[in-house]
Amino acid sequence: RQQYPIITDEKIASYLSELGDRLVAAAPTELKQPVYEYSFTPVNLKEINAFALPGGPMFVHRGMIEAADEEGQVAGVMAHELSHVLLRHGTANMTKAQNPWLQLGQIAGAVGGAVVGGGAGYAITQGSELGVGAALLRYSRDYEKQADLLGAQIMAHAGYDPRSLARMFETIEREAKNSGGEGPQWLSDHPNPGNRTQYITEEATKLTIASPPDTSEFNAAKKAFAAMPAAKSMSELAKSKRGSGR
C-alpha cells in the first residue's frame, strides 16, 4: 500500500478550505445536508484532477491548481464537484452498483481517515487512484450537465464568472489531446455532455454575479507550488515506492 500524498503546508491547506467553504456558503440551502462534513484537501499530484466523495470530502490535485489561469477556474471545478455531492449523484450511483456496499467500502477504505477527519496521508491500493474509477464516482452525461448548471449558479453566488468553468474544461480537454488520448482521469469520470461551453456560457448570462472575492491567495498558492519540488504523477509515485521497497 502507498500513501496518498496530502499537502500539509498550512497556507495552502487553509486557502483551499476557505475557497471550499465560500462555495458551500453559496450553495442552495435546500440542497445542503446537515449531516455532511465538507472538507477540502490539497493533494501533491500533478494530474489535473479533483473529486468529491459522498458525504462531503473533496480532494483537489496540485496539478488542477497549477493548470488554472485564475482562481475562478479552480472554484468552477470545485463547485462542479460540490454539486455532485449536493445532488447526491454518488449515492444514486451506489444504488445502481452491482454490490453497492462493496463499492462504498472500497472507497471508504481507500480514503481511510479522510471521511472522519484523517491525518497527513491516506493509504490507498497501489495502482488505483483512490477508487475514482469506481462506479460511485463515474458520472453519466445527464449528471454532468446537472452539476455544470448547479456549479455555475454556485459560482455566481460566490462571486465567480461561470465562464471560468467552461475555460477550465477546455484546458482539461486540451491536455487530453496533447497527451495522445491518455488524458486526465477527470475526463473519464466526467464525460462531456456535449455543447458544454455553450450551455455554461448561456447559463452565465442569466445569472447575477456577486461581488468578486479577493483572489490574492490563489497567486500566493501558485508561487508556493513553484518553490516546491515538482509533483509526481500517480504512476511515478507507484514506481518510486516500488523502487524503495515500500
Each model region followed by its residue ranges:
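A Zn2+-metalloprotease active-site environment signal
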Residues: 1-246
